């Protein structure tokens, strides 16, 4: 028997079946680096319209976690897809390098500044530490396949950037947005510094909850207000608080103007409370026998005075909108130095912003004899005992409540009035302008807009000063006596910025004021404060984007970070840009959710449910991680676990197998010589290219809308359904058995070539390593890298006016599905082995019958059977299977007649009819020794 294997066009490619990504990717990365792939892309895109995604700088501390990976991969997908869409999209990664966490790390190793090291040496250690952290994170980000200018990232500690941060502050001062004030700020007594809102976390804490009576100074005036004369004992206004330690700073009692307040007679005294809370307060203080003597509106009590229980002065009743009936007594203890609401209302009434607490959290000398030098959290019991002794304590109990804590130390923080510098939200209309700017930005998802609007509408002035060592100095000089800024502040700041540009922030601390102030130096002092690190990162639109040459003066198109950044980087950037330039720093803001485990739980080392990106890359490869990120809807929480990553690996295999099939069947195809013109191609091949065209339209639309999970779903549908379960199955016969250089085979290869050219580009932003690998195996002249090109433009489809248009093939797909069901049943019943052992008769109503008949003998190739006949629907025998999908179709199956051809495996009656090729069928004889078969349709 002759061996006809050598006459077949068997698929062949060096493209491996197994991805082996964990092993193969590092070598590809090395090639990208050696070739300077990022530089090649920049050169290729030079002069195109720009799309700038500005990197929000991660903090230079610790290893990257899965959340970092999600963030960088999403950015990379966008940058690469924009490149393929014809944009020049430079990506400059950055790092946030100043601030408390780095100081704490350096402190742990070397001690506090001023102990073993000078502050200057301490700063040098911080700079060194940040640089090593940047290097570690950079390696991991590169390993993810993220392309960017990794050799020249921006660091907020670059001398030039530090100088530009100072310049940004100068511009804000010049525009009139800075003011100084004693104001309550979140204060950590362990850090001994003010904290930004983003540095505050909430934990449960147990505190004493107390009801305290403030006796009225003028009892008769109160009786008159309530129109009563018979009151037994003194009258008091009762406040409720869970922070007894703040009582020394009390300067008023806030009540609501529109609430009804009741004068309640209890044993030996009368108390004033909100009428709606009388019952709950009486229950709490254990009084069952009480009488309401009268009621008045809160507004009636404004400015009546009450004696502080132990401080020896009296305080006014004032009206505030922050008073609620949720808990307490309807009268709020007000200490302007210890709370933002208290501060705001204190300003309105001209109250003192008293601050009896030092930076270490202990009372300052002269506060009160038994409290001086005591830590405020230890003082609660002393204050309670004091109130008891003075007869002012009506009730005390322990209460668990949510309390603000330092994100670093996890210890409770306090509100403490300190002299700080603020960017004012209202003195020059910053709030109003920011709210206006928000409306001109596209927020993705769109709920981001309402979220940041409410934050901007309600946020207090931004405290931008910090009492730290490792940070950008505010670079201000204030008058010794008046504490006013130097009249030449902007000039002086530019002078400092020039020095910082050369020598870094240490230049400020080394600066002798005489050098730039001359004789005035004796009258001015250098402000020792540093800037909040959120000012560093929030000003990068100016300190980085405006000055990097690759951005050519264009503003950022997009900021993309986790959803916690509405209150963080998106907010600080908006504030600074609007204060500097009167406009938002971005056109689009995209936020992604946090990563959770497979059960939806937050990632936590203590639960042990964290997923390390390094582990995933070492086991499965970066492309699997990238595919997981792309296939997850980032607008909500992003679940990741071993099981979920395994599913991503399964999807990856399907895509890889499709790519491998295309490459293997392009064996021997040279597009320059072998390409078949569309009008000469087999109709099914044109249909397949049309499928790719339709898929490309959907995929490009999804990339444009940043719907990457839609990209993956459409890609999977194309690979699995349109190609895998239909087209690629059908063409195997023609690919393998037709004459190597026949139109029948070259038409098919032409289709596969067009499909592969499109597919490799669809994959490139997401499966970057695999796309690069596929690119290397594609036939034909091409650039070295897929990333330098654009979406494939060589796709075409069938015209609707053609008889065998898309609708025709859609119906054929359904027919084939119905035939497959019948074949599967026959296989289960052991009537046939494979589908080529079967012949089918399709009993069809006239319209469908005409379509099926149009394919002639090629119908069997579409159905993958050895025989296919079309007959009248009404002639169907009783055992023909009625289609559930197509009402006008019944299918009958019989065993195919004739012998099996060993070359094409079809059963046919003409095997052995040609003497020289006695073992094979007539079709194969023609393909081996004759002119070759002709195919028109399939």
Swiss-Prot record:
Its cofactor is Zn(2+). This is Isoleucine--tRNA ligase. One of its GO terms (biological process) is isoleucyl-tRNA aminoacylation. One of its GO terms (molecular function) is aminoacyl-tRNA deacylase activity. IleRS has two distinct active sites: one for aminoacylation and one for editing. The misactivated valine is translocated from the active site to the editing site, which sterically excludes the correctly activated isoleucine. The single editing site contains two valyl binding pockets, one specific for each substrate (Val-AMP or Val-tRNA(Ile)). L-isoleucyl-5'-AMP binds at residue 561. Monomer. HAMAP family: Ile_tRNA_synth_type1 (MF_02002). Binds 1 zinc ion per subunit. PROSITE patterns: AA_TRNA_LIGASE_I (PS00178). The keyword rRNA-binding does not apply. Its EC number is 6.1.1.5. The keyword Transcription does not apply. A motif ('KMSKS' region) lies at residues 602-606. It catalyses: tRNA(Ile) + L-isoleucine + ATP = L-isoleucyl-tRNA(Ile) + AMP + diphosphate. Catalyzes the attachment of isoleucine to tRNA(Ile). As IleRS can inadvertently accommodate and process structurally similar amino acids such as valine, to avoid such errors it has two additional distinct tRNA(Ile)-dependent editing activities. One activity is designated as 'pretransfer' editing and involves the hydrolysis of activated Val-AMP. The other activity is designated 'posttransfer' editing and involves deacylation of mischarged Val-tRNA(Ile). Gene3D superfamilies: 1.10.730.20, HUPs, Valyl/Leucyl/Isoleucyl-tRNA synthetase, editing domain. Transmembrane segments: none annotated. Belongs to the class-I aminoacyl-tRNA synthetase family. IleS type 1 subfamily. It is found in: Cytoplasm. Its main location: cytoplasm. InterPro entries: aa-tRNA-synth_I_CS, aa-tRNA-synth_Ia, Anticodon_Ile_BEm, Ile-tRNA-ligase, Ile-tRNA-ligase_type1, Ile-tRNA_ligase, M/V/L/I-tRNA-synth_anticd-bd, Rossmann-like_a/b/a_fold. Zn(2+) binds at residues 901, 904, 921, 924. The modification N6-acetyllysine is found at residue 183.
């Amino acid at each position: 028997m002759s061996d006809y294997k050598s006459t077949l066009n068997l698929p062949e490619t060096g493209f491996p079946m197994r991805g082996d990504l964990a092993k193969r990717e590092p070598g590809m990365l090395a090639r990208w680096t050696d070739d300077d792939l990022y530089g090649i892309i920049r050169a290729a895109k030079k002069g195109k319209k720009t799309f700038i995604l500005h990197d929000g700088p991660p903090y230079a501390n610790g290893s990257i976690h899965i959340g970092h990976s999600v963030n960088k991969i999403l950015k990379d997908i966008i940058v690469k897809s924009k490149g393929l869409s014809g944009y020049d999209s430079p990506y400059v990664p950055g790092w946030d390098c100043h601030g408390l966490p780095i100081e704490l790390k350096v402190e742990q190793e070397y001690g506090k500044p001023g102990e073993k090291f000078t502050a200057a040496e301490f700063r040098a250690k911080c700079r060194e530490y940040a640089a090593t952290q940047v290097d570690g994170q950079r390696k991991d980000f590169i390993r993810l396949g993220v392309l960017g200018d990794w050799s020249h990232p921006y660091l907020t500690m670059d001398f030039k950037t530090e100088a530009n941060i100072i310049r940004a502050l100068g511009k804000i001062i010049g525009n009139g947005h800075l003011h100084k004030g004693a104001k309550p700020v979140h204060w950590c007594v362990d850090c001994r510094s003010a904290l930004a809102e983003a540095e505050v976390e909430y934990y449960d804490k147990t505190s004493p909850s107390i009801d305290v009576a403030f006796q009225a100074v003028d009892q008769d005036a109160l009786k008159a207000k309530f129109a009563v004369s018979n009151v037994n004992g003194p009258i008091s206004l009762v406040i409720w608080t869970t922070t007894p330690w703040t009582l020394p700073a009390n300067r008023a009692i806030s009540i609501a103007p529109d609430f009804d307040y009741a004068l309640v007679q209890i044993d030996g005294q009368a108390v004033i409370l909100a009428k709606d809370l009388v019952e709950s307060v009486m229950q709490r203080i254990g009084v069952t026998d009480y009488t309401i003597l009268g009621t008045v509106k809160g507004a009636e009590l404004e400015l009546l005075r009450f004696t502080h229980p132990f401080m020896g002065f009296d305080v006014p009743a004032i009206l505030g909108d922050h008073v609620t009936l949720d808990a307490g007594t309807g009268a709020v203890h007000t200490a302007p130095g210890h709370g933002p609401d208290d501060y705001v209302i204190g300003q309105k009434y001209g109250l003192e912003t008293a601050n009896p607490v030092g930076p270490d959290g202990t009372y300052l000398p002269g506060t009160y004899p038994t409290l001086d030098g005591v830590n405020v959290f230890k003082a609660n019991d002393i204050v309670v005992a004091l109130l008891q002794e003075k007869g002012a304590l009506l009730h005390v109990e322990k209460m668990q409540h949510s309390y603000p804590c330092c994100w670093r130390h996890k210890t409770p923080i306090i509100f403490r009035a300190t002299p700080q510098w603020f960017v004012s939200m209202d003195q020059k209309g910053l709030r109003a302008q920011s709210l206006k700017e928000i409306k001109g930005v596209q927020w993705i998802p769109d709920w981001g807009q309402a979220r940041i609007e409410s934050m901007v509408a309600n946020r207090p002035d931004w405290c931008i000063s910090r009492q730290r060592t490792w940070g950008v100095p505010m670079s201000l000089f204030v008058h010794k006596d008046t504490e006013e800024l130097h009249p030449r502040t902007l000039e002086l700041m530019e002078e400092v910025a020039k020095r910082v540009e050369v020598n870094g922030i240490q230049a400020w601390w080394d600066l002798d004021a005489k050098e730039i102030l001359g004789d005035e130096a004796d009258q001015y002092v250098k402000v020792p404060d540093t800037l909040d690190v959120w000012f560093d990162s929030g000003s990068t639109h100016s300190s980085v984007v405006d000055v990097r040459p690759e951005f050519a003066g264009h503003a950022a198109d997009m900021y993309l970070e986790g959803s916690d950044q509405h209150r963080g980087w998106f907010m600080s950037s908006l504030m600074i840009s609007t204060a500097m330039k009167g406009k938002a720093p971005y056109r689009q803001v995209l936020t992604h959710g946090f990563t959770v485990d497979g059960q939806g739980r937050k990632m936590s080392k203590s639960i042990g449910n964290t997923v390390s990106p390094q582990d995933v890359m070492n086991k499965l490869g970066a492309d699997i991680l990238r595919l997981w990120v792309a296939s997850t809807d980032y607008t909500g929480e992003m679940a990741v676990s071993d099981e979920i990553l395994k599913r991503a690996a399964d999807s990856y295999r399907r895509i890889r197998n499709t790519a491998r099939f295309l490459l293997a069947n392009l064996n021997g195809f040279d597009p320059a010589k072998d390409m078949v013109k569309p009008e000469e191609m087999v109709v099914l091949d044109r249909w397949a290219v049309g499928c790719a065209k339709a898929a490309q339209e959907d995929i490009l639309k999804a990339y444009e809308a940043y719907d990457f999970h839609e990209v993956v779903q459409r890609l999977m549908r194309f690979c699995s359904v349109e190609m895998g379960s239909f087209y690629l199955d059908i063409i195997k016969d023609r690919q393998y058995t037709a004459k190597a250089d026949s139109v029948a085979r070259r038409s098919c290869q032409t289709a596969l070539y067009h499909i592969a050219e499109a597919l490799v580009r669809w994959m490139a932003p997401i499966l970057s390593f695999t796309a690069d690998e596929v690119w290397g195996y594609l036939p034909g002249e091409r650039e070295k890298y897929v990333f330098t090109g654009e979406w494939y433009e060589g796709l075409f489809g069938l015209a609707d006016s053609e008889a065998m248009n898309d609708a025709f093939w859609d119906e054929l797909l359904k027919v084939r599905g119905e035939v497959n069901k019948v074949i599967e049943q026959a296989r289960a019943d052991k009537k046939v082995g494979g589908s080529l052992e079967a012949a089918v008769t399709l009993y069809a109503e006239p319209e469908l019958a005409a379509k099926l008949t149009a394919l002639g003998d090629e119908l069997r190739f579409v159905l993958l059977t050895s025989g296919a006949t079309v007959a009248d629907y009404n002639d169907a025998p009783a055992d023909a299977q009625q289609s559930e999908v197509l009402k006008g179709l019944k299918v009958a199956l019989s065993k195919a007649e004739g012998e099996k051809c060993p070359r094409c495996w079809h059963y046919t009656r003409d095997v052995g009819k040609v003497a020289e090729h006695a073992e094979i069928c007539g079709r194969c004889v023609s393909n081996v020794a004759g002119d070759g078969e002709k195919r028109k349709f399939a």
